[in-house]
C-alpha cells in the first residue's frame, strides 16, 4: 500500500523547541514494521493508532518522541 509519511521528531529541550519534520512517499503493507526497521530496533515504546485515512505511530527512541503519520 502506498502512503504519504510525515515523520516528526519532537524536541522537548527548553532551549530548542524546533521540530524536525520529514515528508516522503513510502510503500509498505505494515506501517509498524516499517517504523521498527527505520529506527533499527532502538525503540523503547511503540503506540499504534488506526485512523480511517491511515495510521499514526508514536515511538519513543533514544529519549526522543517520533510521530509517524501514514496517510492514504
Q: Which residues fall in each region the model found?
A:
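Short, basic/low-complexity N-terminal boundary segments at the transition from targeting/disordered tails
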Residues: 24-43
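N-terminal acidic leader/helix
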Residues: 2-29
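Short, mixed-charge low-complexity intrinsically disordered segments
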Residues: 40-72
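Hydrophobic beta-strand residues in large extracellular and virion-surface proteins
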Residues: 3-5, 26, 35, 57-58, ...
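Short non-domain terminal segments
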Residues: 20, 32, 66-68
